[in-house]
């Protein structure tokens, strides 16, 4: 299993390849706000652990193992953002909140959150009911 830091790199590499068709060390460094030498070290570790294939000065490609995990990590991130929107978290806080929790949830918890998101999305009345509960709770606390 990749560490949380490895997950961040795999997720970002997956997104870059999906968006641009490739991922360079400089692109990864910029996206993650880290020094290129840190990216090189992590990419070498990910290569050793068979998440990607890295050739110095030529770039990198995700292995099937890396693609599968990258896909799952992007899904997890997007699902948690969706969940935060449904429960009414302020849009400006969603990204940082998701970054703060995504590595600490089990895949079982992610799957249950997915069930809950699906439940709310199947009937917009459910979201409206939730907003009513939130408003009532807000009024109680004021």
UniProtKB/Swiss-Prot annotation:
GO biological process terms held by the UniProt record: intracellular manganese ion homeostasis
Regulation: DNA binding is strongly activated by Mn(2+).
A Pfam family the protein falls into: Fe_dep_repress
GO annotation, cellular component aspect: cytoplasm
Amino-acid positions noted as binding Mn(2+) 2 in the UniProt annotation, renumbered to this chain: 11, 77, 99, 102
Record's subcellular location: Cytoplasm
Protein residues bound to Mn(2+) 1: 8, 99, 102-103
Positions in coiled-coil regions: none
Keyword set, alphabetical order: Activator, Cytoplasm, DNA-binding, Manganese, Metal-binding, Repressor, Transcription, Transcription regulation
Domain of life: Bacteria
Start and end residues of each HTH dtxR-type domain: 1-63
InterPro entries: DtxR_MntR_Metal-Reg, Fe_dep_repressor, Fe_dep_repressor_sf, HTH_DTXR, HTH_tscrpt_reg_MntR, Iron_dep_repressor, WH-like_DNA-bd_sf, WH_DNA-bd_sf
Gene Ontology molecular function terms on file: DNA binding; DNA-binding transcription factor activity; manganese ion binding; protein dimerization activity
SMART domains (alphabetical): HTH_DTXR
Subunit (UniProt): Homodimer.
Function: Central regulator of manganese homeostasis.
Protein family: Belongs to the DtxR/MntR family.
Protein name: HTH-type transcriptional regulator MntR
The encoding gene: mntR
């Amino acid at each position: 299993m990749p560490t949380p830091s490895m997950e961040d790199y795999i997720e970002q590499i997956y997104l870059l390849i999906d968006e641009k068709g490739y991922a360079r060390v400089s692109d990864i460094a910029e996206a993650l706000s880290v020094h290129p030498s840190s990216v090189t070290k992590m990419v070498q570790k990910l290569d050793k652990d068979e998440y990607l294939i890295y050739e110095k000065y030529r770039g990198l490609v995700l292995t099937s193992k890396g693609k599968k995990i990258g896909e799952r990590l992007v899904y997890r991130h997007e699902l948690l953002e969706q969940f935060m929107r449904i429960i009414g978290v302020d849009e400006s806080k969603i990204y940082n909140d998701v970054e703060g929790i995504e590595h600490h949830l089990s895949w079982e918890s992610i799957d249950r959150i997915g069930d809950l998101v699906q439940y709310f999305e199947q009937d917009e009345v459910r979201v409206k009911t939730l907003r009513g509960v939130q408003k009532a709770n807000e009024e109680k606390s004021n």
